[in-house]
Curated annotation (Swiss-Prot):
UniProt keyword terms in alphabetical order: Chloroplast, Membrane, Photosynthesis, Plastid, Repeat, Thylakoid, TPR repeat
GO CC aspect terms: chloroplast thylakoid membrane
Subcellular location field: Plastid, Chloroplast thylakoid membrane
TPR repeats (start-end): 35-68, 72-105, 120-153
Annotated HAMAP family: Ycf3 (MF_00439)
InterPro entries reported for this sequence: PSI_Ycf3_assembly, TPR-like_helical_dom_sf, TPR_rpt
Membrane topology annotation: Peripheral membrane protein
Organism field: Porphyra purpurea
NCBIfam families for this protein: PRK02603.1
UniProt keyword annotation of Ribosomal protein present: no
Known role: Essential for the assembly of the photosystem I (PSI) complex. May act as a chaperone-like factor to guide the assembly of the PSI subunits.
Protein known as: Photosystem I assembly protein Ycf3
Amino acid sequence: MPRSQKNDNFIDKTFTVLADIVLKILPTSKEEKEAFSYYRDGMSAQSEGEYAEALENYYEALKLEEDPYDRSYILYNIGLIYASNGEYIKALEYYHQGLELNFKLPQALNNIAVIYHYQGVQAVEEKNIELSKLMFDKAAQYWQQAIKLAPDNYIEAQNWLKTTGRMKNIQGY
């Protein structure tokens, strides 16, 4: 089961060693350890662009992982892969599933907004103004939520919200 990791840099090597130590010393069940191992292997495959392998590992981790918080990150990473492959509808589904389990995932909120913004741009190019407005408004809604959770992040989104007049109800604005 364990994926052979290249660990070309110090941080990756350190993470792998620490993760292995934590797995050995924490009082966790066999299933929890196995789920984490699949998750770690999924992250490794994903970082190397091996998306099919990453998805296999994430799906195995989902079968075993019971903790909602941990499941939210697995779902988020699955969404990342689908978004990277241009499968935006599937990506949105997984981001939303992750948010149902953990509403404090600003990166998922941001990525949902990015997809809606992209769809808004596509609608403009197709001269579908009504759809573009709807998509841009949805993007604004999700960016506002992300910014509320992580006010120092998403500067480009904050600038876009300001320049388009969509900055609303965010503390300090």
